[in-house]
Amino acid sequence: MPPRITALTDPEPAASSRRSAWLASDSEGVPIGSAFLRLFAKEGQEHLAELQVAVHRAERRQGVGTRLLEAAVAAARSEGRRSILAQTNEGSPGDLFLAARGFRRVLTLTYARLPLADADLTRIDTIAEQVHDGYRMTHWDGTVPSALAQTYAASRRAMDDMPMEGTDYGTVVWDVERVVSAAEVIAKRGDLLHTVAVLDTADGSVVGFSELVVPGSGRGDGQHYGTAVLPEHRGHGLGLWMKAHSIRLARRRHPDLAGLLTDTADSNSLMRGINDTLGYLPTHKAVEYQLDL
């Protein structure tokens, strides 16, 4: 008997996106799979949707995932989306599933972790304490200070040319409102946002940044978000400098933190080199698939 597919709606849509969901259940009403479709709403990404499909291992290869996928794709089409992205671990059942259903592999990511108990803190301190003529370091917790908000929002364009290979991710348009909103979302869920930034001493503007999100408990693993430098300020080692500062601050502020997590496109050789220099150890690879509608 084919699974029953029940459509669900997101009770709390965000300003930047909203989600649709589908639950697959067997003849007795027992859940056996799910699909979530995130529909981006911000300028520059209105064409895009992001998909997650999961099926109980005992129910795989029986058409459950296909039924869920069909429902999600139909919804994306009805919303006028042109691309659906889906990420899965390399070599996993999801990898095989997406490849067999018309998705094409567009990006490979390496996930890595820095175990803080084993980190070479002397090396990290040496990098963090280097002097970079024409630049100075600053940092803040949570929402960006008002005096830096405008140039910090402007510096987010440093992410625009991040290596994404063939991914149709669009261009994220950042302004002060969006920067503040993103920080508020992190705070609302109980996590702590720490941002390190490099300022141009000539005018005090933000030219690079590195974000780290730590669990509110200060335990477990922190997650690096964006690290980027404006194109006109690259080539001075600012990315390595900022990430070393971020590690050092995390260690000092959260002594019970176990590690730091990061993920980097395999084609982003510069950032992978920074991670290697700082002692991050690869844990696994993920692949980004795209379905063109």
Language-model-detected regions and their locations in the chain:
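Conserved beta-hairpin
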Residues: 7-10, 18-35, 193-208
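Conserved GNAT acetyl-CoA-binding A-motif
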Residues: 76-89, 250-263
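A conserved beta-turn-beta hairpin within the catalytic core of GNAT-like acetyltransferases
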Residues: 34, 40-52, 59-60, 215-225, ...
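Conserved acetyl-CoA-binding loop-helix of GNAT-fold acetyltransferases
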Residues: 55, 61-74, 99-100, 229, ...
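Conserved catalytic-core motifs of GNAT/GCN5-like acyltransferases
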Residues: 39-42, 85-89, 104-118, 276-293
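Conserved N-terminal entry element of GNAT/NAT acetyltransferase domains
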Residues: 1-10, 118-146, 150, 161
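Conserved GNAT-fold acetyl-CoA-binding loop/helix
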Residues: 1-14, 160-181
